[in-house]
Amino acid sequence: MLRRFLKGAGIKYTLGLTATPLKLQTNMGQDGRPFSKLVMLTSRSKKGIFFKKIIYVAQIQEMVESKFWSKLEYQSYDFNTGDLVYNTTGAEYSNSSIKKAYKNQKISSKIVKKVEELYDRRSILIAVPSIDEAKALTTLIPSCKAVYSDMPSQERKETLEEFKSGRLRCVAQVNILSVGFDYPELDCIITGRPTASLSWWYQFVGRVTRIHPNKSEGLVIDFVGAVPKFGKVEDI
């Protein structure tokens, strides 16, 4: 559709901008099993390449040094990956194994204890594997509410308004605020959701990279081995 529009309008040159030049693409192997690989923007389309060449790349470290991104600090803790198994796509761990690892390694208790220590943080966004786990945290952490996909839209809207206004300190979320949630004043994220996806890790850390006069840096708390697995996003 885009190609037809550009051709009909007589547009010869198109400039594309993206914050995520790398994406996971799932393909079928010769053995009949699906596999996933990271592909670049210029080569990832299954319908043919639209963008032909990358003409400029702004490295994340460059963005931090230029103060377009907030400075980041990391705290990463030991995590045993023994319970984790890949799902059928090979792109992510299975939901059941993610929940098993979360439970067996008592990540919920670790999150609660860490939040108690973070008395100097104004707002904390927490990623957990399931709705039940998110709701459980709301009973253990003061000023904490859960956000998930099938909650009433008005309730979700009001919860996020509370969070952004500072009336609510913590939000435990399940795969809904990891991408595209814009709250520049957010100064801390906690990941309690194991992941095999570099894209998810990059996007979630991105929630705390916005600059704001009221914060000096964004704090990333990692309970699931994401930093050892993927590294700091500034180094990607």
Labelled PLM ranges:
Residues 1-74:
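Post-DEXD/H (motif II) to motif III coupling segment of the RecA-like Helicase ATP-binding lobe
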Residues 10-13, 51-53, 69-72, 143, ...:
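Short glycine-/polar-rich loops that comprise or flank the Walker A/P-loop
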Residues 11, 120-122, 167-168:
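Short, high-confidence coil segments that cap the C-terminus of an alpha-helix
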Residues 17-21, 128-130, 174-176, 224:
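A short beta-strand-to-loop transition that corresponds to the Sensor-1 phosphate-sensing loop
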Residues 52-125:
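Conserved interdomain linker/interface between the two RecA-like ATPase lobes of SF2 helicase motors
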Residues 67, 170-190, 197-199, 204-213:
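SF2 helicase motor core recognition
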Residues 125-127, 133-137, 142-179:
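Conserved helicase ATPase core of P-loop NTP-dependent helicases/translocases
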Residues 194-203, 207-235:
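Conserved segment of the helicase C-terminal RecA-like domain
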